[in-house]
């Protein structure tokens, strides 16, 4: 995994400007039940275009008045890298433990839902990732500062393709110590 990366975060312009001006120190972590990498601050790794697409889509939905993208220099530090087989093994073991726990209390596990192939409503993944971090904390293991994973999104780019039009790498920062600085991407007016 790379150590230092550039991350891009789509947001409301006032939020980005508050960080760049020093009025706010950091972006606020997301704690939505569908945050597929668990709770934390989300970035697109090296993908300014995708961050802009996301911010503009939120404007179209009426969730952002003025779209903006802020960049960050990120040190992944102790990272749960989902490109790594050992990381995936840890996630699978956590899922198995949760399955047993939910069976014991006779409750159904949350599911990943959504009309798209990427299952945009990722409640199950969020539960598993947050549980993995909790289990590590309870057992005295070193906490992960970040999570890095591939997100397959969009339509196939041609018939029979395994590649999708909006696939990207997402980063979830669990520790703001990973952020070495914020910046305004070139070409973005203040």
List where the protein language model places each region.
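A general structural signal for short secondary-structure junctions and capping/turn motifs
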Residues: 32-35, 61-63, 160-163
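Short, well-ordered loop/turn elements at secondary-structure boundaries
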Residues: 1-3, 30-31, 36-39, 65
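Short His-Asn-centered micro-motif
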Residues: 9-10, 44-46, 72-73
């Amino acid at each position: 995994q790379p150590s230092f990366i550039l991350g891009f975060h789509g947001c409301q312009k006032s939020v980005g400007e508050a960080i760049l001006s020093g009025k706010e120190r950091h972006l606020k972590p997301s704690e939505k039940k569908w945050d597929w990498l668990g709770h934390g601050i989300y970035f697109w790794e090296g993908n300014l275009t995708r961050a802009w697409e996301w911010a503009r889509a939120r404007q179209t939905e009426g969730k952002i008045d003025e779209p903006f993208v802020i960049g960050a220099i990120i040190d992944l530090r102790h990272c749960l890298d989902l490109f790594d087989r050992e990381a995936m093994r840890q996630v699978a073991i956590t899922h198995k433990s949760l399955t047993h726990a939910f069976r014991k209390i006779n409750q159904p596990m949350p599911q990943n839902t959504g009309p798209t192939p990427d299952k945009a409503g990722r409640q199950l993944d969020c539960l598993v990732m947050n549980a993995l971090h909790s289990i590590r904390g309870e057992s005295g293991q070193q906490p992960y500062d970040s999570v890095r994973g591939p997100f397959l999104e969009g339509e196939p780019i041609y018939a029979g393709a395994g590649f999708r039009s909006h696939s990207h790498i997402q980063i979830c920062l669990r520790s703001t110590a990973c952020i070495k600085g914020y910046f305004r991407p070139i070409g973005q007016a203040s």
